[in-house]
């Protein structure tokens, strides 16, 4: 990172924190975008990163998003001036987010914690030769649409920003 000085950098929060620590006061004026994903960052860690960037010549703010292989891409982001600290950003175009009760499957109102579910044009059709996991992950709701159940907990605030609370389960499928 010190040698190449990238303008746009995306990494896991753990790696971003390691880089900030390793920079030892060096300029970050080259940094236009600093984005993370794959795990959460505490508000204190996010503040540490943003303070370092500001003190060392960058106008960038740490941004995050949410995505899974099952979507083939990111489905929420804080880019393009829709940044809000400690959120996953807002859903991308043609992406719908729904928070559902983990017991009943019913949609929850703004501010209530439940399972993050998404419907997007880029979502997968199925897991290869794994109909059981497909049925658990992709579910048709009362609205007739097929939704990806992420296994993650979160909520949506009144402004449409998605918040991450934690994981219901951890899956490593290879």
Positions of the model-derived regions?
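Catalytic cores of nucleotide-enabled group-transfer and carboxylate-activating enzymes in metabolic
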Residues: 18, 22-24, 83, 93, ...
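Gly/Ser/Thr-rich phosphate-binding loop
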Residues: 6-11, 20-87, 96
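Alpha-helix capping/helix-boundary segments
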Residues: 14-16, 41, 123
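Conserved ATP-binding/catalytic segment of the ANL
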Residues: 109-111, 117-174
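Short coil-to-beta-strand transition motifs
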Residues: 89-94, 148
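Generic short beta-strand
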Residues: 97-98, 153
């Amino acid at each position: 990172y010190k040698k190449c000085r990238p303008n746009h950098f995306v990494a896991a929060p753990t790696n971003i924190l390691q880089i900030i620590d390793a920079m030892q006061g060096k300029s970050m004026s080259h940094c236009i975008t600093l984005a993370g994903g794959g795990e959460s960052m505490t508000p204190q860690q996010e503040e540490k990163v943003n303070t370092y960037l500001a003190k060392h010549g960058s106008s960038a703010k740490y941004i995050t998003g949410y995505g899974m292989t099952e979507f083939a891409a990111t489905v929420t982001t804080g880019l393009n001036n829709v940044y809000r600290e400690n959120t996953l950003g807002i859903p991308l175009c043609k992406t719908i987010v729904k928070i559902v009760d983990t017991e009943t499957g019913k949609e929850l109102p703004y501010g209530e914690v439940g399972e993050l579910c998404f419907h997007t044009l880029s979502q997968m059709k199925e897991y290869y030769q794994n109909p059981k996991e497909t049925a658990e992950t992709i579910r048709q709701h009362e609205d007739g649409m097929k939704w990806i159940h992420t296994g993650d907990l979160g909520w949506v605030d009144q402004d449409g920003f998605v918040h991450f609370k934690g994981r219901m389960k951890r899956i490593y499928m290879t």
